Amino acid sequence: MTFELTTRAIKISLTGVAGAALVCGGLAQTAISSTPTSASDPIGGWSESWGAAMQRPTPGTEDNGPNWSMKGFADQSVRQVIRLSEGGDRVRIRLSNVYGTKPLKIAGAAVGTSAGGAKVWPGTIKTLKFHGAASTVVKPGAELASDPVALPTKPLQKLAVTLRFTEPTGPTTFHRFTTQEAYRASGDHLTEPVSAAFAKSTNSWYYLTGVDVAGGAGAQGTVVTFGDSLIDGVGSTGDERIADGLAERLAAQGRPTTVINAGIGGNRILGDTACYGDKAPTRFRRDVLDRPGVRSVIIHLGANDIAAAKIEDPCLPKGGTLPTARQLIEGHRALIRAAHARGIKAIGATILPLKGALFPIWSPEAEKVRDEVNHWIRTSGEYDAVLDVDRVMADRTDPDRPWLGYVFEDGLHPNDAGYQAIVRAVPLGAL
């Protein structure tokens, strides 16, 4: 989905992804590299308990709030709060420099139990090492895991990860929208549990792409939620995103399963820009297929491709055209084929209602495309199961609109009640 907000005020903008799809014979050609294999067990006993999809650095705007991705960091400490979906007795973090243009120098890293805000519970802070060293360098285009550290954790527990930078990083690899804040302090505050120096904050994650756990109940695989801002959680507060609610639902049923949010607000099937992530077929391998132990993926995509034809956005090419349902369906099929080649189940989420949004995205022609794609998702049998977001969100008297009780103030995205209703509709037996 394509609409961003800050937690300090309701500031919303239609965002999207630029770039033309590679088209041949009217169909988007979306080949995804995938070596046929079965879904692997978590590597070495490790399970990815939290993760984020990385993006190129892009300036913040009045609508989506400021971020530090363009300037980067120098002689600063950055503390980021995440919530695990599964616990264990050991923890490691993974850092990404996938969009970096120079080596990323990490002077230090630490992890501990979050005490709210930028605070960490005293006695829980553990310094991290990388191949036995306190500092490390992440090559451009690469990711790197820390050495494991002993830290008992539980499902749904929040951790604070602190990174120390002593040299200018330049523009950062990051995830733009979160419902958690990242905190910045000048100087070295790596292991301080409470510090007034963490006075600056933004709603983004920087370099941190994953947190893994080992030694717990033994996760029965990983579920990845993949797609646009509906997956990213725009319109929600706190930990009310689909991945969060699904983790809670699985934990309540005693099913140890990790759930990863690989959503990017504004993401599309047919085009990419720096603002809203690589197009879905391009990033599917990194954000879904290459994660350890993935057994199923929930996919919600297509709304931004439809909406981009009617909006004006500096990140989008002017004069966009409405895609055909066939183009979007072919994009979905490419993702399904790639998932199945790895033994991963694919659950298709129907596109949520677009009519009534505060942004000029709806038209009868756009509705026809949405209806055709949704009909295919529901009836083709190509997805292993269906999460019918459209019917969950629809107003019963006007199904092209969302029901007011489930919609955020932008008239499009779910509010917390809407996200909770979507989570209840997830077919757990298909995961």
Task: Report each predicted region and the residues it spans.
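Active-site segments of SGNH/GDSL-like serine hydrolases
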Residues: 300-305, 335-370
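Short hydrophobic segments within beta-strands
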Residues: 226-227, 349
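Structured segments of extracytoplasmic/periplasmic soluble domains
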Residues: 112, 248-253, 262, 287, ...
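Catalytic His-Asp segment of secreted/periplasmic serine-dependent ester chemistry enzymes
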Residues: 351-431
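Solvent-exposed loop/turn segments at secondary-structure junctions
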Residues: 167-168, 229-233, 264-270, 303-307, ...
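Conserved SGNH/GDSL esterase-like catalytic core that processes O-acyl groups on lipids
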Residues: 50, 74-80, 103, 107-112, ...
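N-terminal secretory targeting modules
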Residues: 2-19, 25-226, 235-238
